[in-house]
């Protein structure tokens, strides 16, 4: 039931038709976020693999990025936009939280999204298609695990009734943390050559950097922070894969 709640929460696929999930389970959705990465990463990688057979790789990468956007309903991208607007335009904790809750997109959010997807597209088009697919499957799950550690290291910055999702995530138990780690690391261990495993360090470092920023300026996290952290961790993973690839070849 917890996995189903996570699939319902983090995607726009009709998993809600399977069963009616009680609200209490949505407090644990982050526990299974890396498992959801298997699905969303699989959709993105599968789209790239198939479309690259009959389309130029530049277009295939665009199709792959669009496929995951449709699968997730741009949930994480919404977080990235609000994060950029809040931290870019906010001068105090309260101002940052107020801007992040505003549904309108600002200049910082637009620029952040443009730079993010421009760089992502550039990075993925320079990789071979098999490596790009393996990196996507690996990076999605591992970056979700890294981003999930926000709930274990920071308090929630708002009151529960002020949350967009109307839920505050529970922290992971040691057993759940181990399960999430295995779910995040397994695709990378199975699909990428050992020389690329060094890329796993980049999302961990990105998480530490962002967590420190949130602790200093927000004294906590929000749901938008989780989405932004995932995307930025994933970006750092692909960038490192690209650096290793270009040096090897």
Predicted regions and their residues:
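Hydrophobic alpha-helical transmembrane segments
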Residues: 1-73, 89-91, 102-103, 108-249
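Glycine/small-residue-rich loop that forms an oxyanion/phosphate-binding "nest" at active or ligand-binding sites
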Residues: 78, 89, 98
């Amino acid at each position: 039931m917890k996995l189903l709640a996570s699939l319902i929460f983090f995607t726009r696929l009709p998993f809600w038709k399977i069963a009616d999930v009680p609200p209490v389970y949505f407090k644990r959705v982050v526990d299974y976020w890396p498992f959801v990465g298997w699905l969303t990463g699989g959709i993105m990688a599968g789209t790239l693999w198939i479309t690259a057979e009959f389309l130029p790789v530049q277009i295939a990468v665009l199709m792959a990025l669009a496929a995951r956007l449709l699968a997730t309903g741009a949930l994480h991208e919404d977080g990235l936009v609000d994060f950029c607007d809040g931290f870019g335009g906010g001068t105090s904790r309260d101002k940052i939280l107020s801007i992040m809750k505003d549904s309108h997109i600002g200049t910082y959010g637009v620029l952040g999204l443009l730079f993010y997807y421009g760089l992502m597209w550039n990075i993925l088009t320079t990789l071979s298609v098999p490596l790009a697919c393996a990196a996507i499957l690996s990076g999605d799950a591992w970056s979700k695990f890294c981003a999930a550690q926000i709930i274990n290291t920071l308090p929630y910055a708002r009151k529960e009734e002020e949350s967009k999702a109307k839920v505050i995530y529970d922290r992971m138990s040691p057993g759940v943390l181990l399960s999430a780690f295995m779910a995040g690391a397994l695709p990378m261990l199975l699909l990428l050559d050992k020389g690329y495993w060094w890329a796993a360090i980049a999302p961990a470092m990105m998480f530490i950097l962002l967590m420190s920023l949130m602790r200093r300026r927000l004294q906590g996290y929000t749901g938008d922070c989780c989405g932004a952290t995932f995307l930025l961790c994933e970006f750092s993973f692909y960038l490192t894969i690209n650096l290793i690839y270009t040096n090897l070849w």
